[in-house]
A protein has these predicted regions:
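Surface-exposed extracytoplasmic segments
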Residues: 1-452
Length: 452
């Protein structure tokens, strides 16, 4: 949930809250790209009786830019519809759900997939079944099989899944939001004069046993790329502008044109780069308008905070921030992609347009030995070259903001020793569900009986 509840307005609207975005060359199908957009943050597995579902009144989209202008060339739209078998019971299910057409499953959801390519709309599929939430051993005794039934194969080599999955993003939210007292380094924190937190401690994964709702689509690379093998990817959620309460029906009715309320490209951008007063605005704009926020990338608040919160630990970073040096390294990583010639044998440059998008060079094959630190760990198949489900994006970005990537654009700069070591103490092994080696790659969701 690298972008969960990150802005005041979207924090009130979880079904439209885009929490994570992944884009990678499929490790088991290397002629395809997998795109995954997660929504609905911090789902408690035992959250009945209604559990969780996508919003019938939300337009979910995954966008692809294949010519570097920060605007969509291909968009996949997902619209959902909830159908009740029996509106006269409060039960989500009336017995074990053994298949997607089980008569015991009351609160079902179906969806339509539409592709818009260069302005031309094409409905790819309709009435595709989502799986239920993972309730427990009596209600969903073989959830993995139910989820597999919900993997749908469409014409053109496209595969889709839309439903609950285990949260794959790992982060110590408790320490991060407690004035960044990162547990492995908390003894070095300023601590505001308090004589506490005087020894290092292991990180705690705040998302270890929560679920999300994922929209996953696997598409042949040949159906996405243009002249450049690098794709720009982002997701968005939109609502219609007018909401009217129908007292007789006891429900809201939406009408009018669609208005974007959530956006996500690179992880943690709206979370830690964009200031509080601009977060809601940022969510409504396309990536091509990122120039309006360029100063926050050039002079990021977090890079100035780290030396203040950890006195004496980041002296070189402090000098960089005090000098007002433009962080061209962060602009490249997050806004344009990294041009060729900076990292030997690597580039994911889309052009001069500043746009917050995941940038994936589809010509780079999956790694046989993935390193969750991605490019800074010597693995060009990982973040910021797209983003794989196991990539440690918090630590990668934290180290980048701490200055470890400055030498990419300024060979004279020496990162502080701490810049290459700072972390919240978590790794991909901190995810109890683990990850799958095949579509949809995120783990089986935690069930409500065993994970209350």
């Amino acid at each position: 949930m690298s972008s969960h509840r990150e802005a005041p307005e979207i924090a009130k609207d979880p079904v439209a809250d885009s929490t994570d975005l992944y884009a990678f060359v499929s490790p088991d199908q290397p002629d395809s790209v997998t795109l995954i957009a997660n929504y609905i943050p911090l789902e408690g597995p035992a959250g009945g009786p209604n559990f969780y579902s996508f919003g019938d009144d939300v337009l979910y989209e995954i966008h692809v830019d294949n010519d570097g202008d920060g605007q969509q060339d291909i968009t996949y739209q997902f619209r959902f519809q909830t159908r009740l078998r029996d509106p006269n019971t409060f039960l989500y299910n009336t017995g074990p759900i053994l298949s997607l057409d089980s008569p015991n499953w009351n609160n079902r959801q179906f969806y339509t997939v539409t592709r818009i390519r260069h302005g031309q709309r094409e409905e790819l599929a309709q009435d595709l079944a989502s799986p239920p939430c993972n309730i427990g051993p009596l209600s969903t005794p073989d959830y993995a099989q139910l989820a597999q039934e919900a993997v749908h194969h469409l014409p053109g080599g496209i595969t889709v899944y839309a439903g609950q999955r285990a949260e794959g993003f790992y982060i110590d939210l408790g320490s991060v939001f407690d004035l960044a007292d990162l547990r492995p380094f908390q003894q070095l924190h300023a601590k505001y004069g308090m004589n506490i937190l005087n020894s290092p401690a292991p990180g705690v994964n705040a998302t270890a046993q929560v679920n999300v709702h994922s929209i996953a689509i696997q598409v042949p690379i040949s159906a996405l790329v243009g002249k450049n093998p690098v794709l720009g990817v982002w997701t968005s959620a939109s609502r219609q502008r007018a909401k009217v309460w129908d007292a007789a029906a006891g429900a809201n009715h939406w009408s009018g044109p669609w208005h974007q309320v959530s956006r996500l490209g690179n992880p943690l951008v709206n979370e830690v780069v964009i200031p509080l007063g601009q977060k809601d605005l940022w969510n409504t704009l396309p990536p091509s308008d990122e120039k309006l926020f360029a100063s926050h990338y050039a002079h990021p608040e977090l890079s100035a905070l780290l030396p203040a919160l950890y006195p004496g630990v980041f002296p070189n970073l402090a000098k960089l921030a005090q000098a007002g040096t433009v962080r061209a390294d962060l602009e490249a990583i997050l806004l344009t992609g990294i041009p060729s010639g900076i990292v030997p044998g690597f580039q994911n440059f889309t052009g001069p347009v500043l746009a917050d998008m995941l940038r994936l060079n589809t010509s780079i094959p999956p790694s046989s030995k993935p390193n969750e630190l991605g490019l800074i760990g010597g693995d060009p198949a990982g973040f910021p070259n797209g983003r794989r489900v196991s990539d440690n994006v918090f630590t990668i970005e934290l180290r980048a903001f701490a200055g470890v990537t400055v030498p990419l654009v300024d060979k004279s700069f020496t990162p502080d020793a701490a810049a290459g070591a700072v972390t919240d103490g978590l790794t991909s092994k901190s995810v109890p569900s683990g990850f799958l080696g095949q579509f949809p790659y995120l783990g089986v969701p935690y069930d409500g009986y065993d994970t209350p």
